Amino acid sequence: MIVVQSERIRYDTNVINTMRKGEFAMRAQNLTLLTDLYELTMMQGYYENPSDQIVVFDAFYRKNPCGGAYAVCAGLEQVIEYVRDLHFSPDDIDYLRSLHIFNDDFLEYLRGFHFTGDIYAIPEGTVVFPREPLVKVIAPIMQAQLVETAILNIINHQSLIATKTSRIVHAARGDGVMEFGLRRAQGPDAGIYGARAAMIAGCIGTSNVLCGQMFDVPVKGTHAHSWIMSFPDELTAFRTYARLYPTACILLVDTYDTLNSGIPHAIQVFKEMRAEGIPLTFYGIRMDSGDLAYLSKEAKKMLDAEGFTDAVISASNDLDETLITSLKNQGATINSWGVGTNLITSKDCPSFGGVYKLAAIMDKKTGKFIPKIKLSENEEKITNPGNKTTYRIYGKDSHKVIADIICLVGETFNEDEPLLLFDPIATWKKTLLAPGTYTMRELPVQVFKDGECVYHSPKVMDIQKYCKEELNTLWDETKRLVNPHEVHVDLSKPLWDMKHALLDKYHFE
């Protein structure tokens, strides 16, 4: 393990205070040093032992998060921004020099460093499964090595939050789910990009105003208990809020007494609005504490009795997919859900186990890729070698996902011929699909070609629409929250043969 400490001179506070705001913004966008130290020490090793090898790295994950049977891929737009701006600034070079572990020649090389390779990726919002490459980097080895940490950091975080959100939205059974987690997120970036991922996976809005501005997504919110407490009484607080926001009048009713004060006062305000001819276009109550199942049913009775049958009954308070499912099963009349902590932190499953592994090295003489494999005592950690792509297989009549198949680039398939699938771990398991019973779609798209971005990132709300379409291709059994049916990710025969040839080779060596 290398342990180093910078001898860099501390910035003068007055200098920092006089820097232009834009300079900070530009510096924040250059994330080239958002990497683990060993990426840079390996790069210097490649530089000192000249290697311009073209390699293939795959970013993938091994196990579905949150006990589910799928994940929702997210974060590609931020990966693109990172790669586009990949360069070492003079400040970066100065800092690396201060560590006293990098040679001057190598640091000089870094001054002109930029990405020149190819990247293929599965589009955001796509439902994905273990072991299939979410991002594939084909580039000179130093470039491909450097981008590992940032790619995993971005994809792991946003895919985790998107997957967790998808489960919460599924539990809500068509009710609106709002992302309310900014104040509980692990820092500003986690709040902003976590909210972005939540919108991709189906939230109807976020409380995060900066996220709304950055990604053009709906922002939503009501008021806090402090609003009520700042007035002489609850009724005055409600009346004032209703005058300000008559077309979005959701009143928080649990500051003092939900059933004996909050809801009766809310109903009184709604009656006054109705009497004054104010259209009740979007109105209702929110509860943030107590027995939400019981309180919501009582609230529904009280609202219906006064003719407010279309009032929104919204709930918050440490919600997640398990609690929402329980409330639904108890007959709760809640039809709008504000989910914060457990969504933005993915509290019960706080990590997405994405990894980044070398899969092939190009033979300079032939231009063909030489497959590479990582072995392990744990068979699930044995990698799939070669330059690969992934196809999704659907039932021709059902249009539902049957399986995914990982294959070598260049393989062709004919949907009018039988298709033989090989389990990557249980080698005795094979599946034969009859001709004419399935359709196939290649998942990855090219994002960078020779260092230039060739992909247009869709808007977040367009990604959300695509994600909903993706989720509709899954059987209900795959989307259930407990003990779901898993979709198989199989190997083609050529890839299966390649993998087992390498296993045999290294076994006997």
Tell me what each language-model feature is:
Residues 176-179, 218-221, 248-251, 283-284, ...:
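Structural motif
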Residues 20-53, 66-68, 304-306, 311, ...:
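Gly/Ser/Thr/Ala-enriched C-terminal appendages of enzymes
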Residues 15, 19-54, 63-65, 101-102, ...:
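Buried, small/hydrophobic-residue-enriched core segments of structured protein domains
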